[in-house]
From Swiss-Prot:
GO terms for molecular function: peptidyl-prolyl cis-trans isomerase activity. PROSITE patterns: PPIC_PPIASE_2, PROKAR_LIPOPROTEIN. Keywords: Cell membrane, Isomerase, Lipoprotein, Membrane, Palmitate, Rotamase, Signal. The keyword Membrane applies. This is Foldase protein PrsA 1. The keyword Glycoprotein does not apply.
Amino acid sequence: MKKWLIALAGVLLTFTLAGCGSKTVASTSGGKITESQYYSSMKGTSSGKQVLQQMILNKVLEKDYGSKVSTKQVTKQYNTYKSQYGSSFSTVLSQNGLTTKTFKEQLRSNLLLKEAVKDKVKITDKALKKQWKSYEPKVTVQHILVAKSATADKVLDALKKDSSQANFTKLAKKYSTDTTTKNDGGKLSAFDNTNTSYSSKFLTAAFKLKNGEYTTSAVKTSNGYEIIRMIKNPGKGKMSDHTADLKKQIWDNDMSDSTVLQNVVSKVLKGGNVSIKDNDLKDILSSYLSTSSSSSSN
């Protein structure tokens, strides 16, 4: 299927298909290139067709779900990426042929598509139970990262005598090689089972800890040796207490599932009263409009 705005980079939405005519797009010593010539050339290419598909989908999504996606939401997601990439953010945008404006357009399109997924996909009890198996609530930990096993042993010996948060903080400042967190006692931002920043070994070890507990042996990861201490673990509790979180995680997974997205886009376009006026492009949505499928996470 075509990729519907689910990545940072993609086809830019600046190509305009409407209003093509005799206006000159470019001129050369060999003659002019008009909008109509440009349009005729582009509509026959895969990138040109992809842009039109995307524009059609965006129009329908805006009509159906535009009121559910605010500028504030787009800005919040934009700032998250900006913070993640730091000083290299502008370079990353440029390398992907994006500007602040076009990137925010993509983020908005992605949020609109997510609203469509939430609307069109039925989440079954079976799906909730399956997600519950891997679910872990957000926890807050502090950690000490060291390069050598001997150093880890030294830290663990000190913790055997005093495993308090104050002492762990002191040890983190002295030994940790994680320069971004050591001065704050190794404290990390809260995370749950959907976290992809830390290794599976790190996450597994962390989620096993109760408040005040620490890993009594170092966790070996690709970064070195990790010693983790739990600051706050609310406990998993009952599934019924976390239905909203479970649904959110399922929808997030659906956004990476091409089959689910295919079905959702098909439903959205079928309900969008789409009419293709150019005969050369009449079949551009055939793979979506000709299929009949049901969407459910089960």
